[in-house]
């Protein structure tokens, strides 16, 4: 995924109202940018940290700039735009960069499924293959020694998705929970049972029901983002 034009940068002043952030540019002018991430953003939104933003060509947008990346004091890069994770995984599958998913012929997104009226992030189909339901989750919470965690806050929506994936697996389909790691400092991923015990419990049940876990990390810069490596996962 290439950023065209290349992302611009500034210094974070503050994030507020969940969807907005004020930044200071190199010329000391200030600008309000849109923040697509409504989560806790723990460690991703420290005042005076460097942020990178894109500019929309949509002239009707009230805030044409979108917060894409943050750089931490340890020089780690984090993608804070939650819309990017699905786009990255779709691109990686289409480019045959996810070795576990190269046999499928057709890819669809946002398809209705399940008994709880959800929409699956990605549905793969192929001749003589079980349908493959993929739910994508972005991982940006870093603890010590390279340990990444998901979720970074209690997620009832995520719990619902686990129940839906379990249902698909029990019906004989392939069901995958795909962790897209969008923090350059993360070396391995685990479930944050200390944050959301119910999610942890539901994932154990989902795995027992046949849900598979994939965990891949992206490389990120002001010019592009792409899925590049598989990371270890533990429950």
Swiss-Prot record:
Q: Which family does it belong to?
A: Belongs to the SfsA family.
Q: What is the official name of this protein in its record?
A: Sugar fermentation stimulation protein homolog
The disulfide bridges present are none
Q: Which GO terms describe its molecular function?
A: DNA binding
Under the heading CDD domains, the entry gives: SfsA-like_bacterial (cd22359)
